[in-house]
Each structure stands twice: as structure tokens, then as C-alpha cells.
Amino acid sequence: MEKDNDFKDPFLASTEEEELDPATQKALMEYLGVGSRASSLVSFSSTAVDIPPISGVGDFVREFRIESRKLWKLAGPAIFTTMSQYSLGAVTQVFAGHISTLALAAVSIENSVIAGFSFGIMLGMGSALETLCGQAFGAGKVSMLGVYLQRSWVILSVTALFLSLIYIFAAPILTFIGQTAAISAMAGIFSIYMIPQIFAYAINFPTAKFLQSQSKIMVMAGISGVVLVIHSFFTWLVMSRLHWGLPGLALVLNTSWWVIVVAQLVYIFNCTCGEAWSGFTWEAFHNLWGFVKLSLASAAMLCLEIWYFMALVLFAGYLKNAEVSVAALSICMNILGWAAMVAFGTNAAVSVRVSNELGASHPRTAKFSLVVAVILSTAIGMFIAAGLLFFRNEYPVLFVEDEEVRNVVRELTPMLAFCIVINNVQPVLSGVAVGAGWQAVVAYVNIACYYLFGVPFGLLLGFKLEYGVMGIWWGMVTGTFVQSIVLTWMICKTNWEKEASMAEERIKEWGGVPAEKETLLN
């Protein structure tokens, strides 16, 4: 297949595929490591054969039903998991709002700026496993998953040590970037309390991607759901009965994240993952540089997305009446985050489907999975937005006591509803990029669309033209819309047959495959 043909195939078109003779097929299967045991594992997440070309409405509807069921088996538990884990911080923020407006602003700034900065790096670096584990699992190289997991633990734990310095010096950092003295001081104290959380991230994110790549999502959902219930109870206890204030909120939030980590590790170590986990190995320290490169590319891609909306809250701190602006916008970002968890759940599902199918050399199934995911995500986003508009006068009461903040939130609700629809589709497109291994390319797209276009446009509307919070938000959402258009164009023009053939090369380059398997069918 020609190298210059990456973006020439119609999106759902038929392609001629060469038939391999039986001897070549056998050699290929041996090379890929797909024996009877491995192939049974592959079939759990990928289709037995690639779907036939879509040639009409009837074919589309039939395959849509089939793929929808496969996606929802993954997306349903993934959505529940992401919403439960996101709600840990959201519950903390809700209780902070009942302390004072300053406490809400401080916790919001810590969550959005300090923790948000670290969260983006750690989750992004952990997302390298979505590509490697997903494609390796699809190709039948199940035994490598545990090695990849341990490499990611090593890299992220070292990263957490460096990032903890940001937590320690959060107060002067926030003051330097222009936050008020009161917000900076309180957010700085809360940041120091939250240092244990970043080390939980270092273990949790790779572990979650390891389980996710094998479609073991139900156990993640169960753990997260139970922890959320416990977290909500103890947060209420330390705030409403013990009156421990911000230290109590930090104690409960840190503990909740570590309970999730320990529970997932117990599940893995209890021999529930078969060949995927065979114990600790020194091989985890081999080929770290190749793994670091993919981890950094993944981090760059995701951080540029997460920091983008983190910057929105930061810019609001420069407006007049900063405490009210930050508090109101943080409530909207909180709700947007909840809604985004649905999209991130679909992101996780489509990333698993795309990476597994590319690893199994099923390009048509991989790209059709994307089509289904985009349709479902758009419909869900519109449903959530409609409900939010209907209850726009009621829901602010749940977050804050200050009536001035509530009124600003009500004014921002139409913008929030529109943003939910856009942001429900964008993570799905990013999920395809992760599943296919395009992290580095998408990072450049994000820089151009978000930071060279969206941020300047938002600042122009918000400060120069004096539209305030609404103007900043409109400008930045426009950047997200442009990025989604670019990703859609890339996906539609991609040669998916070549992506499938490149999956094995990515596994070798980024994951480290034994040298004796370096050549395919000499």
C-alpha cells in the first residue's frame, strides 16, 4: 500500500483486499501470536472477521444495531465509572460551596488549575496504554499487557514526584498568574492537603487503561460506584457533623482515590486477568524511552484539551468581581464535566473498539465503530442539554448559597447547553485518535485550534469587547468546534487499511517487541 495514500479512501467505501494463501495466513497467525487461547481472548473485544462494505441503508441499520450493542457493553460501565470518579471531586466542591463563596472559589481553582494541570499530564501519559494495550490485545499479544502496565507505573510515579512541587508552591504560582491574594492563599493550603491524590493518579490511570483494554470495565464500575457512596457519606459526616472544613474535605477525597487504587490492584493480583498479568518483571524497565515518547505524546494531546477549559476558569479570575465570576463559571464547568463523563465513557469504549479492531486487522469495523459512537454521543448531548435548559432556574440552588452567583449561572446556562453538545462529540473523535495512535499529530491540531485561535478569540470577546465570562467562553468553544471539524476531516480521509497494517509496527516501536519477531514473513 502506498505511503502517500493515507487520506484517499472514502470513509465507508469498499476496498479490495488481497487474499492470502493458506501458508501465508498460518505464518501470519504464528507471528501475531494468535493461537487458540489468544484468539478466544481477541474475540471478546473484536469481531471475528471484518464487517462487509456498507452499500445501502439496510446494511447501515443492520451494522448500526450490532455495533451499538458492542459499544454500549463497554460505554455503559465506562460512563458510570467516569461519572462516579468525577463526582468524587464534584461532591467535594458542592460541600465547599456551603462553607463560603471564597472556599468554593479556592477549591475550584485548585481543582481546575493545580489538580487540573497534574490530572491532564497523568491521565494523558496513562492513556498511552489505550493504544498499546488495545492494539496488543487485538493482535493476541496478551502477555505484554502486564509489562506495559508496569512500565507506565514506573514512568507516572516518577512524574508524580516532580508534579508534587506544583502542589507545594501552589499559592505563589496562583499569585504570580494573577489570582487574588485570598483565593491564592486558601487554594494553596488546599493544594498541599491534596498531594497524596497525585500519587493515586500515577497508579490508577494506567491500571484503569489496562483493565479497559481487556473490556474488564464492569469491575471498575462496581469499585467506583461503591467508593462514591462511601465518599459522599464521609464528606457529609466531616462537614455537617464534625465541621472539619477544608482539611476534612481533602482527607476524604484523598482516601477515596486510594481506595479505588487498592481495590483495582487486588482484582488484578488475584489472578483474574489470565495471561495479561503474570507478576512483576524486570522487563518493565526495558525500552522505557520508546514508552516515554508515546506517553508524552498522549499527555501533550490530552493536556492541551484539559488545560484549555482550565484556562477559562483562570481568565475569569481577571474579570471584575472575580469571586462571583470564578464561582459561577466553576459551577458550569462542574456540570460540563459531569456531562463530559458520558462522552469520556464513549471515548473509552470507542478507543477500545478501534484499537482492538485495528490490532485484529479489521479496518472497516474500526471506522464504522466511530460512526456509531458519534451518532450516539450527539443524541445523548442534546438530551442532556435540553434537560439543563428546562431546569435552569432550579439547579443552581444545589451548588451555592449566594444568590448573585446563582443568577450568573442561570445567565450562562444556554451557553453551557450548547457547549455540552459540542463537547459530547469531541472526546469521541479524540478516542479514535488514541485508539489509532495519532496522539502527536492531534497535539499539533490542538495547539493551532485551541491556543492560536480559541484563546485569543475568547480574550478578544471577553476583555476587549467587554462581553465578560460569556465572551471568553464563546471564543473558546469556537476553538473546540474548529478542532472537531479538523479531526473529522482527518478521520474521513484516513486510509484505515493502512492504519490496521501499521498497528503491529506501533506495538513494536512503542512497546518493545522481542528482536526475534522483528521481521514479518521474510
Swiss-Prot record:
Presence of the UniProt keyword Transmembrane in the record: yes
A GO cellular-component term linked to this record: membrane
Lineage top rank: taxon: Eukaryota
Alphabetic keyword roster: Membrane, Transmembrane, Transmembrane helix, Transport
Consequence of gene loss (knockout): Short root hairs.
Chief place of localization: membrane
Compartments reported by the entry: Membrane
GO biological process: root hair elongation; xenobiotic detoxification by transmembrane export across the plasma membrane
GO terms assigned for molecular function: antiporter activity; xenobiotic transmembrane transporter activity
Family statement drawn from the similarity comment of this UniProt entry: Belongs to the multi antimicrobial extrusion (MATE) (TC 2.A.66.1) family.
NCBIfam families: matE
Name the record gives this protein: Protein DETOXIFICATION 31
Underlying gene: DTX31
